[in-house]
């Protein structure tokens, strides 16, 4: 820069570009040591914020992907099944005999419904709209009741009737012959893995 440009014009003297020179002088004043410190401080804050935004933009999608993968591995009930406790239940809309109902449930990797406590029994009663086959059966009225997995029923709840197959109705647990058409309830453990 030549000395002519930095020369302060005399009072009353005007020359072409005088406004530019005044602007230059004011600009030089703006870059004082005090202004430099403020400038560095602002630049530092901007850089910290930029790094934070970049870090968050990288971290958030990774977290979202991780959550999606975790959600895919949680235990869930299959579509059209209802979960309670650690079990899933399926309530049929059609009627059939006890043997067909059990075959249907087995095809779904389940059994005719088994309940292990009063809470599960009450849940089943609330969700059915007519009598439904459940997983209780026996060879004759002389034999004990068994679940479809062949474990013996503990007789916690009274079973009415002299039939060989158990069903659930508004009146509780009853029994009848296996050929009578009824709706049915399947049950399975809720460790079913959701397949996407």
Swiss-Prot record:
Membrane-side (Cytoplasmic) residue stretches: 1-41
Membrane disposition: Single-pass type II membrane protein
One Pfam entry name: Lectin_C
Subcellular location: Cell membrane
GO molecular function, one term: carbohydrate binding
Segments on the Extracellular face: 63-196
SUPFAM superfamilies: C-type lectin-like
Paired cysteines (S-S): 77-88, 105-186
Residue ranges of every copy of the C-type lectin domain listed in the record: 84-187
Residues modified by glycosylation: 97
Top-level taxon: Eukaryota
Alphabetized PROSITE patterns for the sequence: C_TYPE_LECTIN_2
Chain's role: Lectin-type cell surface receptor.
Protein name: C-type lectin domain family 2 member F
């Amino acid at each position: 820069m030549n000395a002519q440009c930095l020369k302060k014009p005399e009072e009353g003297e005007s020359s072409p570009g005088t406004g530019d020179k005044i602007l230059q002088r004011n600009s030089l004043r703006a870059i004082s040591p005090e202004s430099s410190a403020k400038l560095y401080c602002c630049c530092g804050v901007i850089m910290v914020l930029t790094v934070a935004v970049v870090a968050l933009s990288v971290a958030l999608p990774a977290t979202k992907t991780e959550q999606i993968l975790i959600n895919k591995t949680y235990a869930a009930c299959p579509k059209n099944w209802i979960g309670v406790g650690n079990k899933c239940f399926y309530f049929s809309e059609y009627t059939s005999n006890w043997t067909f109902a059990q075959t249907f449930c087995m095809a779904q990797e389940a059994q005719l419904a088994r309940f292990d406590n009063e809470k599960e029994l009450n849940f089943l009663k609330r969700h059915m709209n007519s009598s439904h086959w459940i997983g209780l059966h026996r060879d004759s009225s002389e034999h004990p009741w068994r679940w479809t997995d062949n474990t013996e029923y503990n007789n916690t709840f009274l079973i009415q009737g002299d039939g060989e197959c158990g069903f659930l109705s508004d009146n509780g647990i009853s029994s009848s012959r296996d050929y009578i058409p009824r709706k049915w309830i399947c049950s399975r453990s809720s460790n079913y893995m959701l397949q996407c």
